[in-house]
């Protein structure tokens, strides 16, 4: 009698990576099930609104949106926007890229912090969130004073991409290595192309500013991780 074959997991990734990807999908599902009024509230408080960020009571936005009332309300969308997506294609693409990029990163971080789970997972999450905040700040800065709103985890995922590309250079190489600069240039060119063709091809604007900011944030934070790896091996 042949033993039963084990079915492969739906998401072939370590559970922290699979769990984070599922959080993105479940968050979108829950938001989509809310009444329209509550969906609008989630978008209002969780999306990045350059108009709200840059306006004030003395200089109101052109659209009439009120400015953020305090620092926490202004900072919240820099993280919360990662868990809000425009549609199902948006969230599924981001979840797929998250799994593809976070899996090798988590494996590397487990070699830096062996036997100290959830330390490696927390480090990976911190890298993602740092890149997401960097992407949000870049988007707000380059959308001054009244750009359109932005949502999605692509800024943090761009940071994971930079981290993966930097891994290929090894812990002893820096951000100005030739291969990393070439890969980064291709990333910038790809975003420039999608910024022009995105509205006609995808029916939506591409937040290229967020992608570039997240990429730089991910590269800088990953450089710190690789520096820590060098110290452990010394």
Regions found by a protein language model. Name each.
Residues 1-234:
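A detector for small-residue-rich transmembrane helices and their helix-helix packing motifs
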């Amino acid at each position: 009698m042949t033993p039963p074959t084990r079915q492969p997991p739906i998401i072939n990734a370590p559970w922290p990576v699979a769990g984070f990807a599922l959080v993105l999908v479940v968050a979108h599902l829950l938001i989509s099930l809310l009444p329209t009024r509550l969906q609008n509230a989630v978008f209002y408080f969780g999306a990045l609104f350059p108009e709200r960020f840059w306006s004030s009571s003395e200089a109101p936005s052109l659209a009439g949106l009120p400015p953020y009332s305090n620092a926490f309300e202004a900072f919240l969308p820099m993280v919360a926007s990662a868990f809000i997506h425009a549609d199902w294609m948006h969230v599924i693409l981001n979840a797929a890229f998250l799994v593809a990029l976070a899996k090798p990163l988590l494996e590397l971080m487990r070699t830096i912090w062996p036997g100290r789970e959830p330390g490696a997972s927390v480090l990976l999450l911190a890298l993602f969130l740092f890149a997401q905040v960097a992407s949000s700040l870049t988007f707000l800065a380059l959308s001054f004073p009244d750009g359109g709103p932005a949502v999605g985890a692509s800024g943090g995922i761009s940071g994971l991409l930079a981290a993966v590309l930097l891994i290929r250079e090894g812990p002893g190489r820096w951000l100005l290595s030739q291969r990393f600069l070439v890969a980064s240039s291709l990333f910038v060119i790809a975003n420039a192309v999608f910024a022009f063709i995105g509205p006609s091809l995808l029916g939506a604007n591409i937040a290229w500013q967020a992608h570039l900011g997240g990429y730089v944030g991910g590269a800088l934070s990953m450089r710190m991780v690789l520096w820590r790896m060098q110290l452990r091996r010394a």
